[in-house]
Regions:
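Conserved, mostly hydrophobic/aromatic
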Residues: 6, 18, 46, 59, ...
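Acidic (Asp/Glu)-rich catalytic clusters
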Residues: 7-10, 40, 60-71, 102-108, ...
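Active-site groove signature of glycoside hydrolases
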Residues: 100-124
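N-terminal binding-site loop/beta-alpha segment at the start of enzyme catalytic domains
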Residues: 1-74, 141
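Active-site mouth loops of central-metabolism enzymes
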Residues: 19-29, 79-95, 121-125, 234-244
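Beta/alpha (TIM)-barrel catalytic core signal, keyed to glycine-rich beta->alpha loops juxtaposed to Asp/Glu
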Residues: 118-284
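Short, acidic/polar
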Residues: 25-38, 89-106, 152-160, 245-253
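Acidic-and-aromatic substrate-binding clefts and catalytic sites of carbohydrate-active enzymes
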Residues: 23-29, 47-57, 81, 89, ...
Length: 284
């Protein structure tokens, strides 16, 4: 496994990371074993945006006894309300949800405290001088979180955050298809309904390309989410390119963008872990 410095955090993270979103699909013992298997393969960074109790419990149990082997991205503002995920800045939900994260992960610290899902300039502006941001900064000062990051799908908002000096790293959606989309595209809607490209569109979205360079310039490390576009790029009928890409191609694309330190892949099986980790030994 190769490791890269994650921007200003100084953390040496594995190029192949772990996106925890799919853990709740499977029986708890299988998911715990899968996460431990990934650790044995050298994977040392996991994103836990998920607020549901099952996912958090799995991660906590999998890390028990080897917490120091994992860097955790834990999110402020991802909450579980009435059995549903709700993104919010309301402190009556934010604080208990973060405390729940610590409890279920069986840890007294989170390596990277993530400002969750900031996709509009309005949302970014509203964070300034907010109780939400004060809470994040307070957790940093108290050592409960060691670093501050942010997750976003929008290059304009991300650029504002990078230039602000607030964040040390960015969780951003990077894949060959998303990088050709016009800015402002609703990626959640796109993943639900499929890709619809203007036939005249060609080449990378310059705002996204500029963001990667900006992150490199400001030493804000990038970890990659949605590197496979939810698996759609592996299906020629759902891929906007008309051909199926391979995991290896998507991983290579993400890891060769400026500023990128790690791609956080979702896994259902040990074989999928092996397939992703095999990138490290693949020839150019």
């Amino acid at each position: 496994m190769n490791y890269k410095v994650l921007g200003k955090t100084g953390l040496m993270v594995s190029e192949i990371g772990f996106g925890g979103e799919w853990l709740e699909r499977h029986p708890e013992d299988e998911s715990i074993e899968l996460m431990r298997y990934a650790s044995e393969k050298g994977i040392n960074i996991i994103d836990c945006w998920m607020p549901d109790p099952k996912s958090r419990d799995i991660i906590g149990k999998a890390m028990k006894g080897n917490r120091e082997k994992w860097y955790v991205q834990g999110h402020f503002g991802s909450t579980w309300q009435n059995g549903q995920y709700v993104r919010t800045r309301d402190m009556q939900y934010v604080k208990p949800a973060f405390e729940d994260l610590l409890t279920r992960l069986q840890t007294d610290y989170i390596d990277i405290g993530m400002i969750h899902y900031v996709d509009t300039v309005e949302d970014w502006n509203s964070l300034q001088d907010s109780d939400f941001l004060k809470y994040v900064l307070d957790m940093k000062e108290k050592g409960v979180i060691h670093h501050i990051g942010m997750s976003s799908h929008d290059p304009k908002v991300s650029a504002l955050a990078v230039k602000s000096g607030l964040i040390e790293m960015l969780l951003f959606s990077v894949n060959p298809a998303f990088d050709m989309l016009p800015s402002g595209q609703d990626l959640g809607e796109l993943l639900e309904e499929g890709f619809h490209y203007d036939s005249g569109l060609a080449g990378i979205n310059t705002e996204r390309a500029d963001l990667y360079k900006l992150c490199e310039e400001y030493n804000v490390g990038i970890t990659v989410m949605k590197g496979f576009a939810g698996g759609r790029l592996f299906d020629e009928k759902r891929s906007p390119f008309g051909v199926a890409l391979t995991p290896m191609q998507c991983i290579h694309y993400a890891l060769t963008r400026p500023g990128v330190a790690s791609i956080l892949c979702g896994y259902d099986t040990k074989e999928q872990v092996d397939e992703a980790v095999a990138y490290e030994n693949a020839s150019e």
